[in-house]
């Protein structure tokens, strides 16, 4: 299947924040770009400027001053199909430079994705892009595959949504899946807010990107939040400086760990919800008593919002406190977890045993979009 690039399968992981796309069998995605579509706010004044009616990804990001930006994927679920089509078109033709009608395509979906959504994805792939075959896989399951496991519980936290997904022998257990609408975007917003309290002003979408960069470079998770706050108050050992694009240097202290602490204490941003350690525990407790031991011993972190230094140690500490005292608890935090969904897709689509799993164009023509529920589960 993968001996030549002519028929190699494509793998496209559509996240709320970033699209990750590339070829099955590769060890990393070729294209990673923001999941945004921008449209000009005003009609172009200058004739012949070749102004397009829409821009996708990095180009939309760089022209954001004159555009209205929209994210077609909210909280992991596709909500705007016209814009989503534009993103897929951009992925195939501009980023990967392939003809989709020549490549089987593996797409990813959020856990508990509505049935109508899976059908719509299937329909667009076959009818708009004429793919020869396609498959839809649950993101968390792919992350687990990427870590070399088939049983475990995945904490997948990206830009738009966080899920706890217990998986047994390769199958997600839907009754025990937890969803938390708190993820990277909310943490960036929270960091903007607490930096404003320090006297720095960040308001525009352009400034938000700067804050996201500060977050990614300087934030970390404290092992003991109260202790860390005390240390930050009594000395400057935790302070770091960051140079803004205009050359101004700002200093940030306790904000570095107050920002991601929100994952463990959602009340920081006014959310009445359990933290990620409690949702993990609750998810395990909804599973059959016989498999809990396997889940506790295989806690896999996945997604960009699990990239904070210190998060694995903190999860270990918090879950140990909740679980039975004799239980062996292990947190697995692979270094490439930012892309582990994509990597899992790349592994899956290049397995010889997977080749019979594809939904083919012929099967689609015979059965229609609902075929996806029979073949992808």
From Swiss-Prot:
UniProt-listed Enzyme Commission number(s): 3.6.4.-
PTM (free text): Oxidation of Met-46 and Met-49 by MICALs (mical1, mical2 or mical3) to form methionine sulfoxide promotes actin filament depolymerization. Mical1 and mical2 produce the (R)-S-oxide form. The (R)-S-oxide form is reverted by msrb1 and msrb2, which promote actin repolymerization.
Gene3D superfamilies cross-referenced by the UniProt entry: 3.30.420.40, Actin, Chain A, domain 4 (3.90.640.10)
Molecular function per GO: ATP binding; hydrolase activity
Gene Ontology CC: cell body; cytoplasm; cytoskeleton; filopodium; lamellipodium
Keyword Nucleotide-binding: yes
Listed PROSITE patterns: ACTINS_1, ACTINS_2, ACTINS_ACT_LIKE
Subcellular localization: Cytoplasm, Cytoskeleton
UniProt similarity note: Belongs to the actin family.
Protein name in UniProt: Actin, alpha cardiac muscle 2
Organism name: Xenopus tropicalis (Western clawed frog)
